[in-house]
Amino acid sequence: DVVLATKFGNVRGEDGSRLGISGKPEYVRSACDASLKRLGVDHIDLYYQHRVDPNVPIEDTVGAMAELVEAGKVLFLGLSEAGPETIRRAHATHPISALQTEYSLWSRDPENELFSLIRELGIGFVAYSPLGRGFLTGSFQHYEDIPEDDFRHNQPRFMGENFEKNLQLVRKIENLAKQKDIMPGQLALAWVRAQGNDIVPIPGTTRTKHLKENVAAVDVKLSAEELQQIDAIFPMDVTAGDRYSDMSGVNI
């Protein structure tokens, strides 16, 4: 089965330029209609707010999203990169089915508060960038391996000393993966899945080879000893550098 999920929130101009974030009810409705038209479908299974708009009460945004459910245009609602208080307020307005937030070996922040909260409320967790934007696959052994026009050039974890420190961690993951005769990325995905049945990783790729590797990670099982070894390599907050150069748009 295919679950069709899409987001709204990043407003763009006709030329594709970024115009900021909007959670205004009228934008929620117009964005949904535009997505339905582009996708050629009569409903969206899971509709996310891409980023919380700090200038619009979450009750107003989710209220408009709830109207889409009532109209049959959307089946379930989701949030992305929302903080605990926002999640509670949103869920009180209309049941939230999924929270999409970055989570991987090198981004373990959700373990602090979010996991206990969403499990209390019965919200599923969708882990984006479970491969650390490709870094955990071992694809980048040198800073020069990153294409010049790639957005990762300006991401803190991929720059300078941070790159080198994080690379040393990944090399240890590569060694563990080699012992299991799997790819580093498969080990990283298996670790995410091992954190709970309510966690769904969504790795992205542009290559069929990597897609097949990611799918095959479903069959990778990690023992308690292996999980301990991985935790010892990548404990909370060991990663050098922030996730983004500007962290103001997350955990709101």
Spans of model-derived segments:
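Short, hinge-like loop/turn segments at secondary-structure boundaries
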Residues: I21-G23, T93-S97, F115-R119, H142-I146, ...
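A short, structured active-site edge motif that brings together acidic residues
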Residues: D1-R12
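Conserved, mostly hydrophobic/aromatic
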Residues: L4, S35, I44, P57, ...
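Aromatic-lined glycan-binding groove of carbohydrate-active enzymes
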Residues: P110-D149, M183
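Glycine/proline-rich, positively charged
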Residues: V11-D109, E113
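Terminal-tail/helix-coil boundary detector
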Residues: E120, E148-Q179, A194-I199, K212-I252
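Glycine-enriched alpha-helix->loop->beta-strand junction motifs that scaffold or abut catalytic
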Residues: K73, H91-A98, R119-V126, N197-I199
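Glycine-rich beta-alpha junction loops
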Residues: F8-N10, G83, Y103-S107, S129-L136, ...
